[in-house]
Amino acid sequence: MSESEVRQTEVIPQWKREEVDELVDFIESYESVGVVGVAGIPSRQLQSMRRELHGSAAVRMSRNTLVNRALDEVNDGFEELKEYIAGQVALIGTNDNPFALFKELEASKTPAPINAGEVAPNDIVIPEGDTGVDPGPFVGELQQVGASARIMDGSIMVTEDSNVLSEGEEVSEELANVLAELGIEPKEVGLDLRGVFSEGVLFEPDELAIDVDEYRADIQSAVSAATNLSVNAVYPTAQTAPTLIAKATSEAKAVGLFANIESPDFMPELISKADAQLRALAANIDDEEALPEELRGVSAADTGAAEEEESTDEEAADADQADAAEDDDAADDDGDDEDAGDALGSLF
């Protein structure tokens, strides 16, 4: 240890040293560690949130300077979280993945009234309709903050949706009073995830705010496209081998029937085909004495039936191939869902 490090250690009070050590232990105890904003959350509500997270995540509050020192001591990339250490913040640790953590924190947020001097988190709109307030000076207060309001049918009505404040603008005292009177709660109170570090990667909220259903559908679509490519390119994999084998079997059978190749697998079809051709030929011979006894009396009308039977045999082979392909496609769809589900399992 250098002299400067010794001096730095010596000037740090013992309680701070112990606090930093505890913070280091906290950071090293979880697979994912993030920084959450806690500004504006009442103490009682914060304690309630911590209880609700018990078992899935833990929240640790401390002085920002000590948190920064702990992040430096852990290193391993955790120091990247220092850029989010500003204002009223806390560390949050979980052994779950960052996506699940973000989803849980967002779901735990609750609507709350906004106070004068606060910044609007989004556009504030007073909706059209009956305010439920009796005629009086409140109609003027509504108009003063930019709402379209008038007295109608013995009540104060907002005649159209009125955007009274844009995102990022400061809330005036007049607007705060109007919103409180109307019971409009334009902000959400909860742990605001600023960033989370997991497995060497730093995630920000906009990267974690994904549509799970859309993401699942994208994965299923990708699996389906990959399966089709594998089948069409005749590139066997564990997932597509059954489809390729069924396809090859069906095509081989069609070739065998067309080329009259003798094989036990399709001998019945060949015999049926030959019989139909023989009967068609016999029907066109006028001298019945030249025919074997079993073929005498075959009428010319049976010719079409014979040709139809031959055509039916070929169509049956094609149908077998199509049925096999449909069965394999159905199996592929089931496999796609399972593969996509497995791919999402670790994230959601």
UniProtKB/Swiss-Prot annotation:
One CC-aspect GO term: cytosolic large ribosomal subunit
Family annotation (SUPFAM superfamilies): Ribosomal protein L10-like
Domain of life: Archaea
Chain segments carrying region Disordered: 291-348
GO molecular function, one term: large ribosomal subunit rRNA binding
GO biological process, one term: cytoplasmic translation
Family matches, as Gene3D superfamilies: 3.30.70.1730, 3.90.105.20, 6.10.140.760
Keyword annotations of the record: Ribonucleoprotein, Ribosomal protein, RNA-binding, rRNA-binding
Additional free-text comment from the UniProt record: Was called L10e in this organism; in this case 'e' is for E.coli-like, not eukaryotic-type protein.
Protein family (similarity comment): Belongs to the universal ribosomal protein uL10 family.
NCBIfam families: PRK04019.1-4, PRK04019.1-5
Name of the protein this chain belongs to: Large ribosomal subunit protein uL10
Protein's organism: Haloferax volcanii (strain ATCC 29605 / DSM 3757 / JCM 8879 / NBRC 14742 / NCIMB 2012 / VKM B-1768 / DS2) (Halobacterium volcanii)
Gene name per UniProt: rpl10
